[in-house]
C-alpha cells in the first residue's frame, strides 16, 4: 500500500476526552473516529488490525471443529421472552418495534437465536456434538461508555455455542475451546492468563475468563506465587484462617463514639488496629428466608465480595443493600453504628471474622460502639461463609504459595451453560434410548474490538503503538528519503516494495512529499514493527537501514539481502 493512496489520518495532539492510552493512540493513529457516545467509525488502519485478529480467530475456531454461521443482530422479542431474559435484562438491552409494532431487540448476545436454530435443525443425538460460531457486531446500551473501544456500546465479538447430549461431551468441547483460546491469544502476542470466573448474567456452572494483564484493566486478577492457580477476584476463595481464635483478654465495654460513623474514623479516633474492627452491612434477604434483611459482617480492612455474598442461601440475588430508612426501621440505628450484639436480624460472618477476638463493632445505638467483643462469650458464633475479597498475601486456595493481585482486561470468556437456555426454549433431541432429551450447552466469547485496545495497552511507548507482528496493520514500512529528488532512491524503493509484496508481506510505502521527521513519527505512531530507510548515503555502499520498532535496534543491510533479512525478522 502506498501512502499516497491511503487514508493515513494521524493526529499530533491527544484528544482531550481520551482517558486511557489505547483510546488516545487509536485516535492519534487514525484507527477510529468517534461518531457518538460509545460508537466509533473504524478507519482503514483499524480495520486492517481487526481483519488480522479475525483471521487468527477463524483459523483456531475452525481447527477446533467449530462451524461458522451468521445470525441477525436484530432479534424478535418473543425469543427473549421465551428464555426469560426479556424481564431479566436491564436497559442495556435496546428494545424497539418495527412498523408493524412487533417488538425486537438489538442483540447483545445470541444464545436465544442459536438455540432456536438447533431446536429446528437437530433432531437426534447422532448429530451432536455441534459447535457453531460467528464474528458479528453486537450492541449493549452501556450506561456510561468509556475508554474508547474498551467499553463501547457497539462492538465486534466472536461468539460460539456448543450443543451436547451429555456433560462429558460438553467438557470435551470446553477443554478444546480453552486450548483454542490459549492458541489465539498466544498467536496474537498477548501476555494473558486464563482465570476461574463467575458466570454472571449468562448463567451456567463453570467459567473461565481470559485476561490480558494491564494496569488500565477493570478487573482484579488473583494469582498464586507457587502454582498455576488464577481467578477473578470475584471468585477467588479466601481460605479459612489457619490460626485459631485467641482467648479473650478484654472486657466487653460500651463506648460513646459520636463522631465515628465509619471504620476509618473509629480507627483514627480510638487508636484501634483496623484488623480489630468489624463492618456490618445490611442487605435484602430472600422471600423464602422469612426475613426482609440480613446482616453481613467482614473485618474492617476487608471488602465485601458481592458475588460470593449473593450465593448465601438467605441473601437475595441480585444483592441489594438496604437503605438507611430500612435499616432504622429494622434496627433503630443508623448504618454507622451497626454490630452483631443484640442485632435483630440473621447474621452471616466472614471466615476471617470468626477467628477474631477482642474486636470493636457498632452497638446498634446511634453514636455508640462495643469494644472487646468476643464470640461465644458475648454472643453465639454466627453462620459463617466466605464473603470477602481476597487480599495480597492471603494463602492460595490450592495450598501452594500466597496470592498476588494484578489488573486485567477481559478479552475472552467461556462458559458451561448447562441447560438454562435449552430447557427454556425446549431444544430437545432423541437420545440413544429413543426418548426426547434436553441438550446441554456451552458458550464461548471473544471481544474482537477489545483485543485491539488490550494489545495497545500492553504494547506502546511514548512515540506510539508497538504492534505484535501478527496483528500489525502493516508488517514493514519503506521510508525513502527525498525520493522525489533522487532517482536512485526511488528506483530502489520501488523494487523493494514490489519484491516484498511478491513474498506476501504487508508493506506500507511512504511515497509522500513529507519531511523525514514526519514520516518517521507516523510510522512509529501507527506501530509498524519493521522499517526500511532508504537514503543516498547508504546506497553509496549498496545498503539500506533497518530499524526494529520494539527494540529500536538499527542495522545496515545489503540491498540485495533485504527481502531475505525481513523474512527472517518475521519468523
Swiss-Prot record:
UniProt catalytic activity: tRNA(Pro) + L-proline + ATP = L-prolyl-tRNA(Pro) + AMP + diphosphate
Database matches in CDD domains: ProRS-INS (cd04334), ProRS_anticodon_short (cd00861), ProRS_core_prok (cd00779)
Keyword Nucleotide-binding in record: yes
Top-tier EC class: ligase
Keywords: Aminoacyl-tRNA synthetase, ATP-binding, Cytoplasm, Ligase, Nucleotide-binding, Protein biosynthesis
Xref: InterPro entries: aa-tRNA-synt_IIb, aa-tRNA-synth_II, aa-tRNA-synth_II/BPL/LPL, Anticodon-bd, Anticodon-bd_dom_sf, Pro-tRNA-ligase_IIa, Pro-tRNA-synth_IIa_bac-type, Pro-tRNA-Synthase_IIa_type1
Superkingdom of this protein's organism: Bacteria
Localization annotation: Cytoplasm
One Pfam family of this chain: HGTP_anticodon
EC number, UniProt record: 6.1.1.15
GO molecular function: aminoacyl-tRNA deacylase activity; ATP binding; proline-tRNA ligase activity
GO biological process: prolyl-tRNA aminoacylation
PANTHER family to which the protein is assigned, alphabetical: MITOCHONDRIAL RIBOSOME PROTEIN L39/PROLYL-TRNA LIGASE FAMILY MEMBER, PROLINE--TRNA LIGASE
Name under which the protein is recorded: Proline--tRNA ligase
Gene: proS
Amino acid at each position: 500500500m502506498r501512502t499516497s493512496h491511503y487514508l493515513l489520518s494521524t493526529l499530533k495532539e491527544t484528544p482531550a476526552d481520551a482517558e486511557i492510552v489505547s483510546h488516545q493512540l487509536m485516535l492519534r493513529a487514525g484507527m477510529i473516529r468517534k461518531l457518538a457516545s460509545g460508537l466509533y467509525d473504524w478507519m482503514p488502519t483499524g480495520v486492517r488490525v481487526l481483519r488480522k485478529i479475525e483471521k487468527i480467530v477463524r483459523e483456531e475456531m475452525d481447527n477446533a471443529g467449530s462451524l461458522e454461521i451468521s445470525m441477525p443482530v436484530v432479534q424478535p422479542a418473543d425469543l427473549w421472552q421465551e428464555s426469560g431474559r426479556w424481564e431479566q435484562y436491564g436497559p442495556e438491552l435496546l428494545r424497539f418495534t418495527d412498523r408493524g409494532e412487533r417488538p425486537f431487540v438489538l442483540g447483545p448476545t445470541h444464545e436465544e437465536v442459536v438455540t432456536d436454530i438447533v431446536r429446528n435443525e437437530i433432531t437426534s443425538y447422532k448429530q451432536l456434538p455441534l459447535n457453531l460460531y460467528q464474528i458479528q457486531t453486537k450492541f449493549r446500551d452501556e450506561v456510561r461508555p468509556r475508554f474508547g473501544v474498551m467499553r463501547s456500546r457497539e462492538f465486534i465479538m466472536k461468539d460460539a455455542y456448543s450443543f451436547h447430549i451429555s456433560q462429558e461431551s460438553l467438557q470435551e468441547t470446553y477443554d478444546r475451546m480453552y486450548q483454542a483460546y490459549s492458541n489465539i491469544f498466544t498467536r496474537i502476542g498477548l501476555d494473558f492468563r486464563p482465570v476461574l470466573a463467575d458466570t454472571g448474567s449468562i448463567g451456567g456452572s463453570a467459567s473461565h475468563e481470559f485476561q490480558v494483564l494491564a494496569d488500565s484493566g477493570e478487573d482484579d486478577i488473583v494469582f498464586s506465587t507457587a502454582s498455576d492457580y488464577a481467578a477473578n477476584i470475584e471468585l477467588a476463595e479466601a481460605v479459612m484462617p489457619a490460626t485459631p481464635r485467641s482467648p479473650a483478654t478484654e472486657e466487653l465495654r460500651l463506648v460513646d463514639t459520636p463522631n465515628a460513623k465509619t471504620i476509618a474514623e473509629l480507627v483514627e479516633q480510638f487508636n484501634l488496629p483496623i484488623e480489630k474492627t468489624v463492618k456490618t452491612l445490611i442487605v435484602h434477604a430472600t422471600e423464602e428466608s422469612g426475613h426482609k434483611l440480613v446482616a453481613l459482617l467482614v473485618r474492617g480492612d476487608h471488602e465485601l465480595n458481592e458475588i460470593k455474598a449473593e450465593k448465601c442461601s438467605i441473601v437475595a440475588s441480585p444483592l441489594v443493600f438496604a437503605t438507611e430508612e430500612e435499616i432504622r426501621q429494622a434496627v433503630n440505628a443508623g448504618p454507622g453504628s451497626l454490630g452483631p450484639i443484640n442485632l435483630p436480624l440473621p447474621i452471616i460472618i466472614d471466615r476471617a471474622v470468626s477467628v477474631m477476638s477482642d474486636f470493636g463493632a457498632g452497638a446498634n445505638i446511634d453514636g455508640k460502639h462495643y469494644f472487646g467483643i468476643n464470640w461465644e462469650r458475648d454472643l453465639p458464633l454466627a453462620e459463617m461463609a466466605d464473603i470477602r475479597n481476597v487480599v495480597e498475601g492471603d494463602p492460595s486456595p490450592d495450598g501452594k504459595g500466597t496470592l498476588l493481585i494484578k489488573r486485567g482486561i477481559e478479552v475472552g470468556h467461556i462458559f458451561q451453560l448447562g441447560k438454562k437456555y435449552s430447557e427454556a426454549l425446549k431444544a430437545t433431541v432423541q437420545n440413544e434410548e429413543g426418548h426426547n432429551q434436553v441438550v446441554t450447552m456451552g458458550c464461548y466469547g471473544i471481544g474482537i474490538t477489545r483485543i485491539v485496545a488490550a494489545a495497545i495497552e500492553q504494547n506502546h511507548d511514548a512515540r506510539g503503538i508497538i504492534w505484535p507482528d501478527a496483528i500489525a496493520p502493516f508488517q514493514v514500512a519503506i521510508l525513502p528519503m527525498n525520493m522525489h529528488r533522487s532517482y536512485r532512491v526511488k528506483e530502489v524503493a520501488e523494487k523493494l516494495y514490489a519484491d516484498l509484496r511478491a513474498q506476501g508481506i504487508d508493506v506500507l510505502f511512504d511515497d509522500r512529499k513529507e519531511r523525514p521527521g514526519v514520516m518517521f513519527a507516523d510510522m512509529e505512531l501507527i506501530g509498524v514493527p519493521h522499517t526500511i530507510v532508504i537514503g543516498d548515503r547508504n546506497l553509496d555502499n549498496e545498503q539500506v537501514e533497518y530499524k526494529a520498532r520494539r527494540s529500536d535496534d538499527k542495522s545496515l543491510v545489503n540491498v540485495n539481502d533485504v527481502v531475505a533479512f525481513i523474512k527472517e525478522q518475521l519468523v
